[in-house]
Amino acid sequence: MRLTKQTNYAVRMLMYCAANGEKLSRIPEIARAYGVSELFLFKILQPLTRAGLVETVRGRNGGVRLPRPASEITLFDVVKVTEDSFAMAECFEAGEIDCPLVDSCGLNAALRKALNAFFEVLQGYTIDDLVKARPQINFLLGLEEPVRPQTSAA
């Protein structure tokens, strides 16, 4: 299974917001950090907002932020909003197949079991887990300046 670019950047946007703490994150800043167009991020933002995964604040000093702790937002929460279909084979799509084995096929059952296992793994990881796995994330995203070692004056 391959996740879409939309899902990839939705997760990245949420990671950026989580790394930025309670401060508002602006779409141009997020776009610059990831080297992607603002328009693409705005497109992704809409379903995330409708699902309650992102909160938007309008106005001159507006932006986006997480509406709840990053530890409460799972990867599954994001994937179920951003992916259109989880059909791993045509027999997953109702009315799309003429196969006489569709109701008793072992492949269908095996793929359904694999898909459920995939969802279970995604439910075990949060946005917070991804952020904490990268100790330098704030520096990498341009949210902080690198800490430079102080040299003593001789």
From Swiss-Prot:
GO molecular function: 2 iron, 2 sulfur cluster binding; DNA binding; DNA-binding transcription factor activity; metal ion binding
Domain of life from the UniProt record: Bacteria
Cofactor(s) needed for function: [2Fe-2S] cluster
Keyword hit for DNA-binding: yes
PROSITE patterns named in the record: HTH_RRF2_1, HTH_RRF2_2
Keyword set includes Lipid biosynthesis: no
Cofactor binding mode and count: Binds 1 [2Fe-2S] cluster.
Keywords: 2Fe-2S, DNA-binding, Iron, Iron-sulfur, Metal-binding
InterPro entries: TR_Rrf2-type_CS (IPR030489), Tscrpt_reg_Rrf2 (IPR000944), WH-like_DNA-bd_sf (IPR036388), WH_DNA-bd_sf (IPR036390)
Binding positions for [2Fe-2S] cluster per the UniProt entry: C91, C99, C105
Record's GO cellular component terms: cytosol
Residue span(s) of domain HTH rrf2-type: 2-132
SUPFAM superfamilies documented for this protein: Winged helix' DNA-binding domain
Function: Required for growth utilizing PHB cycle intermediates.
Protein name: Protein aau3
Organism: Rhizobium meliloti (strain 1021)
